Regions:
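Active-site cores that bind ATP or allylic diphosphates and position pyrophosphate for catalysis
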Residues: 166
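Compact, Lys/Arg-rich rRNA/RNP-binding cores from ribosome-related proteins
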Residues: 163
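Catalytic alpha-helical scaffold of carbohydrate-active enzymes acting on polysaccharides/glycoconjugates
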Residues: 1-109, 114-155, 171-244
Length: 244
């Protein structure tokens, strides 16, 4: 991948259904297989940030992600927010998840649950072998606008929240609004099934129609010259973090 190209980092957070409001794995069981089929159809590869406990409970599905050529990264051992844990417990959560996931594949990428990563843990990520972190977002403090290097870890911000990606007009609007040389999009398998909950940001525009929306969005970015790559690929031309 050349740093001169325009890249779309496509990622999925493989976690229990809409945590902490629901607690099941319907999304993983029913939504994830369709995501893998869609990516095969599009001939693109993505990053799947997997909760460690989910990997233990659904090991066959995680193995299938790897066998189909996608990257797996860590999403913590449970989906508990790291900024609400004691420092050592937070680090152990990351370390435990990486230990589990390395049974399936190499792990160089990380995304914190709820995009909440205390700054002191960035150095710990590097010590644990992580080289790419995607726990920052354009729309949340500190409003990171572009990738940067911190303690040897390349930090790649998320461009837009997943509930916006679910919008019926996302494939028309997002490629016009976000036309940087990099765009980072994430979704969850539970968003591809019909979710019932009182919070609108959880259930609105969820369901099987999201497959077609995602297909249209990816094709819209490809039409603008974007290459779809896993986040872990970002380390290849910039191992020193000096070229971003």
């Amino acid at each position: 991948m050349s740093t001169q190209g325009r890249v779309l980092f496509l990622s999925f957070d493989v976690e229990p259904d809409a945590p902490p409001y629901l607690n099941g794995l319907r999304g993983v069981d029913q939504g994830l297989p369709g995501i893998l089929d869609l990516l095969d159809e599009l001939r693109v590869k993505a990053t799947f940030f997997v909760v460690g406990k989910v990997a233990l409970e659904r090991s066959a599905l995680i193995r299938e992600i790897v066998d189909r050529g996608h990257e797996i990264g860590s999403h913590g051992y449970t989906h508990e927010r790291l900024d609400r844990l004691p420092p050592q417990e937070a680090r152990e959560s990351i370390a435990s998840s990486i230990e589990v996931l390395r049974r399936f594949s190499r792990v160089v990428s990380f995304r914190a649950p709820n995009l909440a990563l205390p700054p002191f843990l960035v150095r710990s990520l590097y010590e644990l072998g992580v080289r790419v972190d995607s726990s920052l977002a354009l729309y949340k403090p500190p409003f990171a606008r572009r990738p940067f290097c911190q303690h040897g870890v390349l930090r790649v911000p998320v461009t837009v929240t997943s509930s916006v990606v679910r919008s019926p007009i996302s494939s028309r609007v997002l490629p016009l609004m976000f036309r940087h040389w990099f765009v980072t999009i994430f979704l969850h398998p539970w968003e591809f099934i019909r979710i019932r909950h009182w919070r609108p940001d959880i259930w609105v525009w969820t369901g099987s129609g999201l497959y077609l929306k995602l297909k249209s969005l990816v094709k819209a970015y490809q039409a603008q010259g974007y290459y779809v790559v896993p986040l872990g690929r970002a380390t290849k031309p910039v191992m020193s973090c000096g070229n971003w």
